[in-house]
């Protein structure tokens, strides 16, 4: 019987690159134990040639964050007619965008913290107007996070005192989600 060939995508260009590389190495090690023919590749300009030459039975997507979990790499794999793990293009896109996800939750009557979206137009002009807007709709403490990032990258729980300082740390993102903080035990799946 022919060994199944699995191409693992790892690394990438997101802020979660190191996490992705760790995931790819772990998956590689476990699949090798099961006697699969496995290679790891970056999702770079050589990817399509690697797919054509290696001819994987399936691509294991170990990419994290932007370009890995947001539907981008999934669309590349679809155009190459390659089977891959994890969700499809549209589901990945919707799940990665926290604002779209929240709209889906609200539409389906799933409880979710109140929120507002903050758009960085000029990082030098962050002022106390945003605090007034938050106080109108939300209560402190709040959670601030990039709309399109995963693995809890750049997530801050803020009180009134440290809010502006933490918001300025996220000035390289265009869109920020600001949610009411809900205390309790945190569980990861």
Task: List each language-model region with its residue ranges.
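ATP-binding N-terminal substructure of ATP-dependent carboxylate-amine bond-forming enzymes
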Residues: 1-90, 94-96, 100, 119-129
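Short beta-strand-to-turn element immediately C-terminal to the catalytic PLP-Schiff-base lysine
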Residues: 118, 155-160
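Phosphate-binding site of ATP-dependent enzymes
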Residues: 159-189
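ATP-grasp fold ATP-binding core
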Residues: 105-106, 134-155, 173-183
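Basic phosphate/pyrophosphate-binding loop/patch that engages nucleotide-derived ligands
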Residues: 104-112
């Amino acid at each position: 019987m022919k060994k199944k060939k699995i191409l693992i995508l790892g690394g990438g260009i997101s802020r979660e690159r190191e996490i992705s590389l760790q995931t790819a190495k772990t998956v590689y090690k476990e699949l090798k134990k099961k006697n699969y023919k496995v290679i790891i590749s970056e999702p770079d300009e050589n990817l399509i040639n690697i797919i054509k030459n290696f001819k994987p039975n399936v691509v294991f997507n170990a990419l994290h964050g932007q370009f890995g979990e947001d539907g981008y790499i999934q669309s590349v794999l679809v155009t190459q007619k390659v089977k891959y793990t994890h969700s499809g293009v549209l589901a990945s896109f919707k799940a990665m965008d926290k604002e779209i996800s929240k709209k889906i939750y609200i539409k389906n009557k799933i409880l979710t913290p109140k929120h507002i979206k903050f758009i960085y137009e000029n990082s030098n002009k962050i002022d106390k107007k945003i605090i007034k807007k938050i106080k109108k709709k939300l209560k402190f403490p709040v959670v601030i996070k990039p709309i399109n990032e995963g693995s809890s990258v750049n997530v801050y729980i803020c009180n009134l005192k440290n809010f502006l300082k933490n918001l300025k740390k996220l000035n390289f993102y265009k869109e920020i989600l600001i949610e009411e903080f809900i205390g309790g035990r945190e569980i990861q799946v």
